[in-house]
Amino acid sequence: MKSKMFPFVAGIAVLAVCVLSPCMAQQSAMTGVGPGVRYATDAYPGFDSEDEIVNPEKKEPRWFSFINGPKMGDSKSQLRYCRELIAADSCSRACKELDALVREWPMSPEAPAAQLLLAETLSEKLGEYEDAFAEYRYLLDFYSLACDYSAVAEKAYRLANVLREEGKSVIWFRFDNTVDVRRAYESLVLRAPGAAFASEAMLTIGGLREDEGKYEQAVQVYENLRNLYPDSKEAAAAVRREADSRMVVLREREYNRSRCKDTAGFLGSALAMCDGDDVQHIRSLQEEVLSMLEADAFRSAKFYDSRVRTSRSAISAYERFLSEYPRGRHADEARRRLEELKGDSQK
């Protein structure tokens, strides 16, 4: 297969416009994320702005069309001729003629069928997956009301997965392409939030955010996935991934008590949402976070245990610490120091 990942990436991203104004007018009642919903009405935290999505370009007749234009004189005859070529296994030639039909007679009744046949032939007969994706995209961009939207979007998504997996095998290219591929999946979710693949796509987006090292955005994506598709298997997988991403942020950033407490709260909730091996994993993360909070609380208590502070302040600080962490790692040390301070105060 030809290596044309950049056109593929641009192609997926452009899919975002597959339900522009004509389609949206027809489907204005379809909102939310239920089955059949074609476009998102809410913000998607962790996604990039739609401003960065490439606008589609309409096909135009080629120069010197008398040489490389359609062979037949009308769209109906041209489509029949293309099907004959495919039946004769002249698929490459058929693709050129199908493309010529769409360019020459874009408003004809045969144009949507020709565009679909072009995409299918590239994918199923020639294995040209990147080109096929671009043609499915074009079908959705310009013939969204004349095609089976859900079926075509599903085919485009399957091709996106194939191309993403192939990109993984090219190590020196994979990481350069991560951002563009993520934006491609985002555009699919934004324009087809009710599709069967939407939750799976969001899980992929979260993983790609992690690949970029954008763990805070990954957390947002996973959290939104759980909220939008709570009963999906991807929502269950997102719990552990969100926990791991939150921990990366916690470990890499300067200590922040609010962030730490928020993470501890999430991990407590996560225990009720997971099962199997994930339970033990979440518990180990929870213990790590609680250890961070305890260490911070102990540092705060020791802050009051100095010559510039009164013994009463230090005693109160250690008592507060022990009331919160009676069995903590620093509890014994805090008790010993508390007894010393109380003994000194009675002298």
Language-model regions: role of each:
Residues 1-2, 12:
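Proline/serine/threonine-rich low-complexity "mucin-like" segments in extracytoplasmic/periplasmic regions
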Residues 9-19:
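Bacterial N-terminal signal peptides
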